[in-house]
Amino acid sequence: QNAVLQALAVLLHRKPKLLVFDVTPHEFVPFVIQSVAEWLGISVLFFQPCSMAPTMLARTNLRAVTSPKGAEVAASPIAREICAFMPQRLKLLIEGLDPKYIQQQRGRDETASSPFHLLKSVPATLSWLWKDRFPRSRDFTGHAGLDGVMGRLAKIILFRSLQSTLRGKVNSLGSRSLPLAPYCVLALHYEPERTSVPEGFPIDFQGDAVVHSRLLVPETNALVVKEHYSQQTSAMRGVAGRSPEFYDLVESMPNTWFAPTQSRLSELVSGAECVITLTGTVAIESVLRGVPVAYFGSPWWEGLPGTVRITDAFSYDDVRGLKLPDQGDVADFLDNLCSSPMIPGLAGESIETMEYRLGPLPQGFFDAVANSVSLCVRREMELT
């Protein structure tokens, strides 16, 4: 309530015509400000990143894309260099390889379990007795109020206990033999993150996604749920988005199974009758393997051939009746999407992270970003 009232007071005092966010508002304060602004009738502009190229969609809400003339990648002098990232990433999806960040997490988890690393981590752990590991605004452990040396010690112990319990539960998933065909796959997202909340709306709790999926899929079809590897990795705080009880809830549903968390999603997808996701790039992997996709949210790849958005009027026949593309169709769709309506940009991502995932950015990239963003802002200002 305080956050909403503060946002309301600031916006009423400042009276802006347009609010611009560098990325889809998903952290608490930006999300509240955006929601209050929309309620007041203030225009909003934000940028949704693409995971396969240094490009983004300019949006005025989760269901509306804006792309003024001259802002698209196609209008940039480095359009060819920017769009060249797409086929490189597409090749990895065709091969079914883990993305770089998952490979890095797997390697880090192996290292973190070694006695040498545990000994090496002692100084860092001791330092958290004197200074909180996470700032209060990002401490999602539920124990942010514990202060002092003893309070911080309790917080360290409690957090590690939560982390250990979750990891044990997640790594025990898939102990039952998976069902024979036919089955459908629901690929969960790491939570909390932008691609699930808010881009996965109207789903804001992935347990609801499981329930909806189970109701959509015929009773004779098994629903195989695949947890995201990142949810239990030592590098992330998966305890902020899941609890062991979540998995008990899912397993209590009829004809619903978990795949082993360590397994590759691409291998599971190949034998599925359909795949369901919020906004994940598993949709691209699936249609490349001849498997149709149903999705809930507002992904950057929306409109991909072989996919359909789940709405109130959706039925299972809608996904079964989809015409599936070949690899050339998928490549053409992504190339056209990259050219327009996408614009150059990182959408709040750091240069280091983007270059680690995709490779070096082309020369002149940030000039192209500045030009495109300024055109988008100017267009929205003219419309207000």
Enumerate the language-model features and the residues they cover:
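Nucleotide-activated donor-binding/catalytic signature segment of Leloir-type glycosyltransferases, i.e.
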Residues: 240-260
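Structural alpha-helical scaffold elements that stabilize or flank donor/cofactor-binding regions
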Residues: 12, 177, 267-268
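A short helix->loop->beta-strand "cap" motif at the edges of active sites that frequently abuts
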Residues: 40-43, 221, 291
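A donor-sugar binding/catalytic signature common to diverse glycosyltransferases
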Residues: 21-25, 260-307
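Active-site and donor-binding regions of nucleotide-sugar-utilizing enzymes
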Residues: 1-78
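Leloir-type glycosyltransferase catalytic cores
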Residues: 71-121, 305-384
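Conserved nucleotide-sugar donor-binding subdomain of glycosyltransferases
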Residues: 1-27, 99, 103-160, 334, ...
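Conserved catalytic-core segment of nucleotide-activated headgroup transferases in glycan assembly
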Residues: 127-243
